[in-house]
Regions:
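Enriched but not universal
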Residues: 1-45, 267-282
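Short tryptophan-centered beta-strand motifs in secreted/extracellular beta-sheet-rich domains
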Residues: 157-159, 195-231
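Flexible glycan-contacting loops in extracellular carbohydrate-active proteins
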Residues: 189-191, 195, 221-253
Length: 282
């Protein structure tokens, strides 16, 4: 069962809390979980690090969680000092080993700026960046082959705590099948280049969401939100990215990204409530 507490006017489930001694999200909702990335610990049995970070001296270090199950900011700042920190790897907490990584410096998303942990609503955030000089945006790539972690063609559910940080960004993609294209000045109604999506595809902060165009995707998601997607993946495509990387299209800035295989509609609202219980988005 999920315990419920009250903080101010916000109901919080135990599965949404990150403090020690409380039930973690994937302890309650771990069935058919295929990938799980977060700035907090999601599963009690997970003993690995949160992410691997490169500092301004190009030294890489795995950063774990503190005693409360949150990203260890003390260790992170000791590593980065007064400089910047960039994400080399974001470790999968599902137990399946699907690390997201970026080994090239320029496309690495940022987590520390000038000795300060980047945050949104009080929680660390992996921040997307665009580099006009190289025509690149930041992105993280799932270690191939993708089918090891996302084995079947068909229905998947995606839960992401995220925001559009740059004027051009893409939530995720398979090869060139792009999902939720945010572009600040574009009136294109092509907000995804992927036909494999089901009815009622999107929910934003627990309610149905239908973007009008790419500019609408950018503006309506420019602050922290919980995006839920009921979609499909194709196991004939070997690549999977958070972000895109070319034509200045970066990753959406992100705090959490969780993927389930199969139909999770019966748990959808409960998972959203649990996630919101930790991040206090809406």
């Amino acid at each position: 069962a999920i315990g419920i507490g009250i903080s101010g006017n916000v109901f919080q489930t135990r599965a949404g809390l990150g403090s020690s001694g409380s039930s973690l999200l994937l302890d309650e909702y771990g069935t058919n979980n295929k990938l799980a990335y977060s700035v907090r610990k999601l599963r009690t049995a997970y003993t690995g690090s949160c992410m691997r970070v490169r500092n301004g001296s190009s030294v890489e270090l795995d950063i774990g969680f503190d005693a409360s199950g949150n990203l260890d900011e003390s260790a992170l700042l000791t590593h980065c000092g007064a400089g910047d920190g960039f994400v080399v790897k974001w470790y999968d907490q599902s137990g399946n080993g699907g690390t997201m990584e970026q080994t090239i410096d320029i496309p690495q998303p940022q987590i520390v700026s000038s000795g300060v942990v980047l945050k949104d609503n009080g929680k660390p955030i992996i921040t997307g960046l665009s580099d006009l000089s190289t025509n690149q945006g930041t992105f993280l790539e799932l270690i191939t082959p993708k089918t090891t972690y996302l084995p079947s063609t068909g229905q998947y559910f995606f839960f992401s705590v995220t925001k559009t940080e740059t004027t051009r960004s893409i939530l995720y993609c398979e090869d060139r099948r792009l999902q939720l294209i945010a572009q600040s000045t574009s009136t294109s109604t092509n907000t995804r280049n992927d036909p494999n999506y089901l009815s009622n595809t999107y929910r934003r902060n627990g309610t149905a969401y239908t973007p009008i165009d790419r500019a609408d995707v950018y503006t309506t998601n420019s602050s922290q939100n919980l995006m839920t997607i009921d979609g499909s993946l194709d196991n004939s495509i070997s690549s999977f990215f958070l972000g895109y990387g070319t034509s200045f299209f970066a990753n959406w800035s992100m705090q959490e990204f969780i993927v389930y295989e199969g139909d999770k509609s019966s748990d959808e609202s409960n998972i959203e409530t649990a996630i919101n219980g930790y991040y206090l988005i809406y």
